[in-house]
């Protein structure tokens, strides 16, 4: 009878095991019902005090997620809409100005809205990062038990695209925290412009992981991204380029890396996605997803599940 080493048996066992790719759910139905269907398929029930993280959109921008689209879901989870002030001037750089934008864009009509850095900031530890040791976020972040991340997927002038990873990194950071991310930890005040692009993208991934880690290692957070109004510019732009491609749908996952990867893949598959592809590639946008996977935030492999 042949004898086998423990190492050989371990190799056989590993070879027989299979990686369970995270599910990414998809619907073409960009409506309150479609949004609710994706939420239901995720199978995770928010508990405790629930934050709904989204972008309130710069004054002059009309591409942000509309209250008419998201209102039913926000009420379903009994959520408080949360945002932070910006670090680049504009209409959302100070709380009073930001509150006016929130009112003008209709968010007060569907839920309470919390500007999380209104009373200061707190630090979240970053583990396994190349650039960041901490992620500085709005102090009210600590008041929430669960986060539902509602993202409008679109292009971005600096990141190439804005997806779920950007929404929980730059989006949850205080103005000082935003500078830290944009400059890859080299400074915490002044201009956000930085010439080491990959370092900035990697810092976004590291900040996103800090947020996920703080929420039960990703157990108290879920992600839904809406692919409509697909401009090359972000909702933080008050004068964005008009979209020149068709709306695609709504996607959801418990894995933000898989979700962003799936959104990017759908842009590449679209027959009219050339402008957004050019924007993403010119900024090396996929590198945020690459680094997020490298540091263990999630998987670039996924199981695409249509719910239509």
For each feature predicted by the language model, list its residue ranges.
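Alpha-helical transmembrane segments
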Residues: 4-8, 279
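Bacterial N-terminal signal peptides
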Residues: 7-17
């Amino acid at each position: 009878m042949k004898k086998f080493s423990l190492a050989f048996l371990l190799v056989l066992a590993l070879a027989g095991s299979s990686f369970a790719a995270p599910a990414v759910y998809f619907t073409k139905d960009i409506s309150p019902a479609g949004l609710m269907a994706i939420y239901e398929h995720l199978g995770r029930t928010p508990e405790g005090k629930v934050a709904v993280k989204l972008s309130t959109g710069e004054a002059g921008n009309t591409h942000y997620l509309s209250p008419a689209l998201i209102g039913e879901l926000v009420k379903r989870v009994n959520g408080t809409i949360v945002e932070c002030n910006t670090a680049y001037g504009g209409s959302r750089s100070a709380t009073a100005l930001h509150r006016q934008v929130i009112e003008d864009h209709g968010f007060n009509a569907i839920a309470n809205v919390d500007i999380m850095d209104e009373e200061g900031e707190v630090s979240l530890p970053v583990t396994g990062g190349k650039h960041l040791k901490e992620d500085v976020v709005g102090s009210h972040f600590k008041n929430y038990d669960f986060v539902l991340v509602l993202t409008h997927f679109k292009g971005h002038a600096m990141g190439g695209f804005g997806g779920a990873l950007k929404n929980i990194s730059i989006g949850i950071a205080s103005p000082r925290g935003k500078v830290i991310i944009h400059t890859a930890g080299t400074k915490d005040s002044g201009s956000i412009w930085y010439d080491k692009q990959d370092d900035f993208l990697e810092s976004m991934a590291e900040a996103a992981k800090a947020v996920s880690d703080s929420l039960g290692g990703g157990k108290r957070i879920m992600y839904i991204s809406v692919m409509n109004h697909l401009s090359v510019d972000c909702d933080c732009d008050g004068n964005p380029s008009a979209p020149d491609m068709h709306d695609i749908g709504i996607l959801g996952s418990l894995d933000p890396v898989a979700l962003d990867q799936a959104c990017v893949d759908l842009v590449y598959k679209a027959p009219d996605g050339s402008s957004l592809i050019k924007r993403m590639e010119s900024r090396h946008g996929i590198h945020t997803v690459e680094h997020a996977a490298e540091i263990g935030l999630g998987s670039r492999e996924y199981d695409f599940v249509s719910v239509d």
